[in-house]
UniProtKB/Swiss-Prot annotation:
Coiled coil: none annotated. It comes from the Bacteria. It is a multi-pass membrane protein. GO terms for cellular component: plasma membrane. Belongs to the enoyl-CoA hydratase/isomerase family. This is Putative enoyl-CoA hydratase/isomerase YhaR. It is found in: Cell membrane. Pfam families: ECH_1.
Length: 255
């Protein structure tokens, strides 16, 4: 794999986003590789899975360059199929999953991080569910995952504003389970060591019970997000959002 690294060492597996020259922006190839890595982790004997980015950040979200050309229904279907598979596999994985964020976690990158059981961020990290800036709605289960962590009212406000959150702000509102200083692999180490000394099989059973009650809601949200994304990608606001992003100016939305 070119853009995603996978390693498994006994009870701990790591999935590392590795497209640093593009801030780990998720293009079609990278998403496909991420799907493969998540499937490998799910099938492994590991009981803990760590998701992190290499270099200077976690993920800037979906690659904006995939959105600059005319809407391609076939590519859109492939992308959404892959995003949904990654989301469901990460969320349902019979492991204890940890996302360790450093740098930026934005858009789809943040949605994927929120699939984890335990979400950590480096103290200087920045988090944003910023689809609104290009006239889109969250995907990757972002609506469900935000609602689950911070409630519908706060989730809606965050999605509508696209506000950038510091790690401390995100922790205060319940979006994070903790913060750390320095490298994400080292930052996650204390909690991994605690987990390795815990009855992980029982913890994973509890995870499965909770998720069996919620999985149909996540699947429904993914379906609704797919439909909404397809509609919004055809709007003038989305086209203006993309142009403004590329031209490094404020968008002029007209609805």
């Amino acid at each position: 794999m070119e853009f995603v690294q996978y390693a498994c060492n006994g009870a701990v597996a790591e999935i590392i986003l590795n497209r640093p020259d593009a801030h780990h922006a998720l293009n079609e190839q990278m998403l496909s590789e991420l799907k493969e890595a998540v499937e490998m982790a799910a099938a492994s004997e590991a009981l803990i899975v760590l998701l992190r980015g290499s270099g200077k950040g976690f993920s800037a979200g979906g690659d904006i360059r995939m959105m600059t050309s005319e809407h391609d229904p076939d590519q859109f279907k492939r992308l959404m199929d892959t995003i949904e598979a990654v989301t469901l596999n990460l969320y349902q994985m019979k492991k204890v999953t940890i996302a360790a964020i450093h740098g930026a976690a934005a858009g789809l990158g943040l949605s994927l991080a929120l699939c984890a059981d335990i979400v950590l961020a480096e103290k200087n990290a920045v988090l944003a569910m910023n689809f609104i800036g290009i006239g889109l709605v969250p995907d990757g289960g972002g609506h469900y995952l935000l609602k689950k962590r911070i409630g519908e009212a706060k989730a809606k406000k965050l999605i509508w504003s696209g506000k950038k959150l510091s790690a401390s702000e995100a922790a205060d509102m319940g979006l994070l389970d903790g913060t750390f200083a320095g490298d994400p692999a080292e930052g996650a180490r204390p909690i991994i060591e605690t987990l390795l000394a815990s009855p992980l099989l029982a913890m994973i059973e509890t995870k499965g019970i909770f998720q069996s009650l919620q999985i149909e809601e996540l699947k429904k949200v993914l379906s609704l997000e797919r439909s909404a994304q397809e509609r919004m990608r055809r709007t003038k606001d989305h086209q203006e959002g993309i142009r403004a992003f590329l031209e490094k100016r404020e968008p002029k939305f007209q609805a």
